[in-house]
Amino acid sequence: MKKTLQDEIEAILRKRIMVLDGGMGTMIQRYKLSEENFQGQEFKDHSRPLKGNNDILSITQPDVIYQIHKEYLLAGADIIETNTFSSTSIAQADYGLEHLAYRMNKCSADVARKAAEEITLQTGVKRFVAGSLGPTNKTLSVSPSVERPDYRNITFDELVEAYQEQAKGLLDGGVDILLIETIFDTANAKAALFALQKLFEENYASPRPIFISGTIVDKSGRTLSGQTGEAFVTSVSHSDPLCIGLNCALGAAEMRPFIETIGKCTTAYVLCYPNAGLPNTFGDYDETPAMMAMHLKDFAVDGLVNVVGGCCGSTPDHIREIAEAVKNCKPRVPPDSVFEGHMLLSGLEPFRIGPYTNFVNIGERCNVAGSKKFAKLIMAGNYEEALSVAKVQVEMGAQVLDINMDDGMLDGPSAMTKFCNFIASEPDIAKVPLCIDSSNFAVIEAGLKCCQGKCIVNSISLKEGEEDFLEKARKIKKFGAAVVVMAFDEEGQATETDVKVSVCTRAYHLLVEKVGFNPNDIIFDPNILTIGTGMEEHNLYAINFIHATRVIKETLPGVRISGGLSNLSFAFRGMDAIREAMHGVFLYHAIKFGMDMGIVNAGSLPVYDDIHKDLLQLCEDLIWNRDAEATEKLLRYAQTHGKGGKKVIQTDEWRNGSIEERLEYALVKGIEKHIVEDTEEARLNREKYPRPLNIIEGPLMNGMKVVGDLFGAGKMFLPQVIKSARVMKKAVGHLIPFMEKEREEARVLNGSVEEEDPYQGTIVLATVKGDVHDIGKNIVGVVLGCNNFRVIDLGVMTPCDKILQAALDHKADIIGLSGLITPSLDEMIFVAKEMERLAIKIPLLIGGATTSRTHTAVKIAPRYSAPVIHVLDASKSVVVCSQLLDENLKDDYFEEILEEYEDIRQDHYESLKERKYLPLSQARKHSFHIDWLSEPHPVKPTFIGTQVFEDYNLQKLVDYIDWKPFFDVWQLRGKYPNRGFPKIFNDKAVGEEARKVYEDAQNMLSILISRKKLRARGVVGFWPAQSVQDDIHLYAEGAVPQAAEPIATFYGLRQQAEKDSSSTDPYHCLSDFVAPLHSGVRDYLGLFAVACFGVEELSKAYEDDGDDYSSIMVKALGDRLAEAFAEELHERVRRELWAYCGSEQLGVTDLRKLRYEGIRPAPGYPSQPDHTEKLTMWRLANIEQATGIRLTESLAMAPASAVSGLYFSNVKSKYFAVGKISKDQIEDYALRKNMSVAEVEKWLGPILGYDTD
């Protein structure tokens, strides 16, 4: 028998590690080819630029590509890749060359073949050519439109067609291997595999070995489309690749753990060709050949790889070093099997079903025939809301999700495609495998074409005969799916035990022997049929299924058993308690007999032992056919019993402990109820606690130490800590009068009294002058207080002299400064200078949203010779403060900080040298362009001037609240895939606490609104507007802009940081989104300011009452309501007040994802970082007089729960970050604003692209 290429290459892989070549693009760049070089003679008159289209060089500059191939081969590469990464008609459409796809691949393969054969002849070592099939520039799993998560700009069939054309060219050019590489989206790779299988089935060419290489995009270990490495392997292993592995995105060191994972879950050989390290700030790769070779040699020595090479940034020098490094290393020995006896499925994550896997719940509610709610949503076209049905199933424990769109009123394939695409947009649903369920095979195919994971098909049968059965089975295998086979043949549905076994046995042999199905991918459904119908012939249906299950599992190795559970109890429709009990009893027995999985309503299955004993007996009698009257008895039971439920018994068992145990328990659990009486009981025990201070120093501080330890270990969360602090304050509050009385008695007796301090240290905290934001500072204060620090909180807008005086008065050990807005940074610098001048040499902590380690190290620390430390959040503050005050640790800690900050400073100054900026004049030439004359003209607002909104209805705002920032306040952050609201509730670590805090918030919100504790006021204004270069001029109503003076000007800042040379991205400025004065097109600009009043007063009242938790809660809710007010008002602006989107119909999710036209950027934020622009807003719209929202000297808004910004209506407007800018723009901006350069530099300090010191 003739040896195949697969045999030949596999023989080499068993002997040694093979070497793949390196980066093609990296080498092409070295030739510095011009547009003319790319065009060559043939394409000199082509209508589009071709520079950058590396693949065309195989036609226009074949000698260059040939030379690159030779260099890699001479460096030691066993395998070279064709220059065809983007040679599909899909990718080439960008260059207008899609018609050349076949030729491009054929020419590239010819060139590579020629080089390989020449070096084979020259060296006597056979070299191979791998045909590269890249990912294309489109994806099946990710929508290119944020607004339409179900939209795809490519189909599976289009990809198959494109990959077939590419593969034909490669095969005709003589490639030895087909390499599907840089897989960002596994669905695309599955289309490529489908195309190759099709070609080989059609005998287009003899089969070639297949190599598959995925791309893990970062340290999360996932592809761009969200799959883990193991899920990726599971999804593509049906193609039996000779090699599977990873390339691109990561350097070798970063790739190692993911290569290890790949090796553990495949019987294929493993290939690995990483980048030459990670890209630096200029996009270049810094890893030397020696470094890269060292890493890959480690891989080889540890038995991880069979093929190694290089991707981006690697060169023949890298490959030479790599080849030398691994030449004496033994190759990885692939295991004979992995996960033996397991069914392997995948969504974004792998799911293995093995001999010891518990019963698998296949969620049933995404079925238009089985769920009225789901059907109603799908029929109404409300797919996004229908996702909630899927989500609930997964949350309730469904490990696989059944999707069924079989309804005569639906276009089944279209509905299946759309819903599967929606699922792909939701990681918390897409993580589980899908079960594509339909009686119409066209619908099944439609579903399979959307799924990147390994699915289950439900179902096929022998109903239409063997030929139909085998045809469908082969297609399913080509998609890589597992299959459910119904016990149904040409004679009909099997109801008797022996017939069920017979039909399943016949199907098994057909699948395994004629189709080549892995037995582990076969699931039999022996038909769960309805019992309790009153018809005698139905009485044995449950027993027959159970007995058939046992025989099938015993006689057909590897298979699984499933069934649709709801069929069993269909006779008891509407009697949920009866149905759920029947399901629980049936499964209890069926699982014992071998049932592995079932289509169930996840979460509604009762535990067998929890079923009421009378109901349990009735269900047992019905299922096992023990009582002819079982159906009637069940119906009578249903009439006399409700659903019932277990009563939760509260226990106060902890109250039986000692006084110390009770105090500690109350503190840890945040229970206030008994704290005063327990504290008093301790106080009265004079023998144990002679003085009230002893109680604070003893049991109370011991309890708070436990709280601090649990918080530090991540076993308690911020809301719990704050509740503990509330209990502590109440206990201390009870003791204070007794301590003061004791102190007074001592003073009278002795004439003076020595102060005693039970605290670890004293810390003065303040939000700096001009800033009104203090939630973060307050939280830090509470956490420090819980850890035995005395906290002096000076509140907001605190002048420097007051901070320093308080530090002296209270003999502070540390000062902590907080700020949210950028001008606060300058105030912090000023405080540091004053501390140095006055020789107040105590540590200075810096925190707040606008602060950073870099700013602290570069701008603040050099002004002060004592420790200056940036503290990220409350959880870090305790560790920092403890080290700063520990006599044994503080000197070493400070020395470490000094060294760290010096490194940060040096890195910063080096980065300033490396940054490149376009001159402002050039940036303006590359501005964002809108063709104002051909675009629809801007809509005029319904009024010009301002409209004030008094006492706005807060209830209207509740639905617009974005809860994610609320949880951020409490430092509750879920981990993927449970980030954000409401997914955070599913997080194992913080979910429970998040739900508690959310419930507390709902309760407080209800009180705040119903009792009118807060008030919302705002203002909106519109004016005619025209852009003049980077500025926007506003005009009075009726004025002719070309002939009138503007009544106000908003000044813009333009991006200047140089973009990559290959980028065509414009350099944005907000003025780009307003029609220019010279265009003659009338345009408009809006502004708004909204606030929630009463928050500070309520917060202060709670604080005075010792209730820090409620104090912080009301501020967090005030901020959320203000943001919700801004969101709701913007919607009204779009639909009513400006009415440029009168027909907009968006849900809250759409608003959160910015799926609307127009933007509302705020001064002081990335699109216009200059806070002084607020002064123009306040003057123009008379905002303070209209609403009561005022500006502080640092231009923060007061009250703190306030939001303001500008309204832009253009459909092309978008948010962007100005980023760093250079001095020429600062000087230009200062001139336009009539400000000094120094003053502008002060306000724009954080975005200066140069150092002013």
Curated annotation (Swiss-Prot):
Main location: cytoplasm
Ligand binding (Zn(2+)): C248, C311, C312
Domain B12-binding: start-end pairs: 760-895
EC numbers on record: 2.1.1.13
Ranges for domain AdoMet activation: 911-1253
PROSITE patterns linked to this entry: ADOMET_ACTIVATION, B12_BINDING, B12_BINDING_NTER, HCY, PTERIN_BINDING
GO biological process: cellular response to methionine; cobalamin metabolic process; homocysteine metabolic process; methionine biosynthetic process; methionine metabolic process; methylation; tetrahydrofolate metabolic process
Disulfide bonds: none
Residues reported in the UniProt entry to bind (6S)-5,6,7,8-tetrahydrofolate: G370, S371, K372, D437, N458, D525, N567, R573, R579
Domain B12-binding N-terminal: 650-747
Keyword check for Plastid: no
A Pfam cross-reference name: Pterin_bind
Pathway this chain belongs to: Amino-acid biosynthesis; L-methionine biosynthesis via de novo pathway; L-methionine from L-homocysteine (MetH route): step 1/1
Sites where the protein binds S-adenosyl-L-methionine: D962, R1160, Y1215, F1216
Note describing how the cofactor binds: Binds 1 zinc ion per subunit.
Single GO term (MF): methionine synthase activity
SMART domains xrefs: B12-binding_2
Modified residues (Phosphothreonine): T1252
Domain Hcy-binding: 6-326
Domain of life: Eukaryota
Subcellular compartments: Cytoplasm
Family affiliation: Belongs to the vitamin-B12 dependent methionine synthase family.
Domain notes: Modular enzyme with four functionally distinct domains. The isolated Hcy-binding domain catalyzes methyl transfer from free methylcobalamin to homocysteine. The Hcy-binding domain in association with the pterin-binding domain catalyzes the methylation of cob(I)alamin by methyltetrahydrofolate and the methylation of homocysteine. The B12-binding domain binds the cofactor. The AdoMet activation domain binds S-adenosyl-L-methionine. Under aerobic conditions cob(I)alamin can be converted to inactive cob(II)alamin.
Protein task: Catalyzes the transfer of a methyl group from methylcob(III)alamin (MeCbl) to homocysteine, yielding enzyme-bound cob(I)alamin and methionine in the cytosol. MeCbl is an active form of cobalamin (vitamin B12) used as a cofactor for methionine biosynthesis. Cob(I)alamin form is regenerated to MeCbl by a transfer of a methyl group from 5-methyltetrahydrofolate.
Assembly notes: Monomer. Dimer. Forms a multiprotein complex with MMACHC, MMADHC and MTRR.
Descriptive protein name: Methionine synthase
Organism: Rattus norvegicus (Rat)
Gene from which the chain derives: Mtr
